[in-house]
């Protein structure tokens, strides 16, 4: 086997015996190989300190590439929108996802209040106003009178009707509370129900026999009260139950007079639609139409006065 000398390997020069000259390429003869190796070594030394930095960069590149591949995979797994069925599937999936994320708060049921001590009249009346059924039941279970009242002769039934506490109204009526009991202004439960505007309570009272034609001290019917307080559904139900559309109060006003005076457009339309008389005069000799004209004339006078004052002010400003 041919053995090369180190000098011959580095310098690329032929040995004296001429056997090793053929080992090196022609380009690396005459010392060129030594220069090439030296240059390569120097370049390698230059890149050596940066080798450790490039490891971190390579790791970062691998992580970035892996992240890109995962993202691409997720995109490929998404539903493709090719027709309406695909669109419907996507919508349903989004709805389910939204439903899963939404936490429905579980409402805790209030613990039943247990009343053991006796309930006095003020507490009973207050409970009817504040919808405390347990207190009302305790008072009634002790065989107390359901028609006890305050200094204005307002009973628990009056208060419950005003606030629309249907369960308490039912409980009081089961205990024998008088539907036609009158307070100091001679209002009955039906007046208070219309004043409060609870349609279900009004229906219950009428079904239990409350007089639809009952009048208070001002001779107002329940329809008068419903119109004045603006409770449209109550007024409509009373009319459907054949309440008197043209009933007059102490001042001779019908419900239509009140509706016009208070400028309740929906009530005016309701009453006229069901046949309220536009020609009935009140104690002052005014029909509902007269009240409309008076209101228009009054409004016109106000605007005329404002216009005149504005004109005078502008003239003074010019001097």
Swiss-Prot record:
SMART domains linked:
ANK
Q: Which residues form a coiled coil?
A: 63-89
**Any keyword Coiled coil?**
yes
Q: Please name the GO terms of the biological process aspect recorded for this protein, alphabetically.
A: regulation of transcription by RNA polymerase II
Task: Give any Pfam family that matches.
Answer: Ank_2
The record's subcellular locations are: Nucleus
Q: Which GO terms describe its molecular function?
A: RNA polymerase II-specific DNA-binding transcription factor binding
Q: What is the induction note for this entry? A: Down-regulated by doxorubicin (adriamycin), in vitro.
Q: Whereabouts are the ANK repeats?
A: 152-181, 185-214, 218-247, 251-280, 284-315
Q: Which domain of life is it from?
A: Eukaryota
Please give the GO cellular component terms listed in this UniProt entry: cytoplasm; nucleus
Which keywords belong to this entry? ANK repeat, Coiled coil, Nucleus, Repeat
- Name the PROSITE patterns on file: ANK_REP_REGION, ANK_REPEAT
Q: What does this protein do?
A: May play an important role in endothelial cell activation. May act as a nuclear transcription factor that negatively regulates the expression of cardiac genes.
How does this chain assemble? Interacts with TTN/titin and YBX1.
What this protein is called in its record is: Ankyrin repeat domain-containing protein 1
Its source organism is: Oryctolagus cuniculus
Provide the gene name from the record: ANKRD1
């Amino acid at each position: 086997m041919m053995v090369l000398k180190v000098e011959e390997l580095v310098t690329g020069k032929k040995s004296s015996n001429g056997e090793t000259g053929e080992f090196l390429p022609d380009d690396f003869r005459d010392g060129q190989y030594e220069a090439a190796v030296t240059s390569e070594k120097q370049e390698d030394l230059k890149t050596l300190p940066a080798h450790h930095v490039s490891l971190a960069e390579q790791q970062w590149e691998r992580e970035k590439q892996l992240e890109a591949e995962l993202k691409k995979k997720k995109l490929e797994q998404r539903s493709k929108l090719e027709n309406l069925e695909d669109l419907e599937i996507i919508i349903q999936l989004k709805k389910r996802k939204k439903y899963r994320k939404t936490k429905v708060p579980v409402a805790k049921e209030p613990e039943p209040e247990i009343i053991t001590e006796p309930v006095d009249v003020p507490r009973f009346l207050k409970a009817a106003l504040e919808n405390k059924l347990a207190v009302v039941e305790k008072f009634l279970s002790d065989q107390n009178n359901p028609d006890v009242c305050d200094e204005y002769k307002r009973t628990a039934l009056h208060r419950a009707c005003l606030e629309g506490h249907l369960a308490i109204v039912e409980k009081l009526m089961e205990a024998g509370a008088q539907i036609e009991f009158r307070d100091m202004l001679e209002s009955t439960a039906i007046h208070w129900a219309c004043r409060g505007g609870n349609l279900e309570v009004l229906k219950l009272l009428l079904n239990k026999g409350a007089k639809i034609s009952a009048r208070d001290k001002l001779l107002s019917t329940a329809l008068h009260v419903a119109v004045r307080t603006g409770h449209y559904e109550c007024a409509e139900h009373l009319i459907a139950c054949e309440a008197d559309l043209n009933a007059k109060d102490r001042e001779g006003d019908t419900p239509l007079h009140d509706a016009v005076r208070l400028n309740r457009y929906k009530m005016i339309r309701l009453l006229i639609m069901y046949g309220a008389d536009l020609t009935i005069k009140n104690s002052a000799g005014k029909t509902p139409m007269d009240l409309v004209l008076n209101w228009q004339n009054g409004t016109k006078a106000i605007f005329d006065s404002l216009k005149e004052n504005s004109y005078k002010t502008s003239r003074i400003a010019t001097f």
